[in-house]
Amino acid sequence: MAKKIDGYIKLQVPAGKANPSPPIGPALGQRGVNIMAFCKEFNAATQKVEPGLPIPVVITVYNDKSFTFIMKTPPASILLKKAAGIQKGSSVPNKTKVGKLTRAQLEEIATTKEPDLTGADLDARVRTIAGSARSMGLEVEL
């Protein structure tokens, strides 16, 4: 018989830097999950990812206090800021532009985010990422 799911925990954890301090410790502790086991497994799974890059993770907690987790791709906004070389997006995106991205950069981000995007083909995914870039005040060359 399959294990009964007790709940889900959604977190954004820096790659390779999971530790028992907040927000990870309290979120897992409330459900009775072994915090150090999660930290070790997560850090091992994110060894090949750039250290410090925030990785969204969905932790499934079972009623016997065991867990599994699914890692998603980094948020598009983080990847866009990194590609444009900026610290933060524009506060008035329709007036003030803070950077510029080429189609090649957008394609690279779209292929990175491919598992999490719903676009049918690469062009549709690029348009999705371009929309996110425009809403951050980045100029897009398509």
Curated annotation (Swiss-Prot):
What the entry lists under PROSITE patterns is as follows: RIBOSOMAL_L11
Could you provide one GO biological process annotation from this protein's UniProt record? translation
- Post-translational modifications: One or more lysine residues are methylated.
Gene Ontology molecular function terms on file = large ribosomal subunit rRNA binding; structural constituent of ribosome
GO CC terms: cytosolic large ribosomal subunit
One Pfam family here = Ribosomal_L11
Q: Which NCBIfam families match?
A: L11_bact
Q: Which family does it belong to?
A: Belongs to the universal ribosomal protein uL11 family.
Q: How does it assemble?
A: Part of the ribosomal stalk of the 50S ribosomal subunit. Interacts with L10 and the large rRNA to form the base of the stalk. L10 forms an elongated spine to which L12 dimers bind in a sequential fashion forming a multimeric L10(L12)X complex.
PANTHER family linked = 60S RIBOSOMAL PROTEIN L12 (PTHR11661), LARGE RIBOSOMAL SUBUNIT PROTEIN UL11M (PTHR11661:SF1)
Q: What does this protein do?
A: Forms part of the ribosomal stalk which helps the ribosome interact with GTP-bound translation factors.
Q: What is this protein's record name?
A: Large ribosomal subunit protein uL11
Q: What is the lineage of its organism?
A: Bacteria, Pseudomonadati, Pseudomonadota, Gammaproteobacteria, Moraxellales
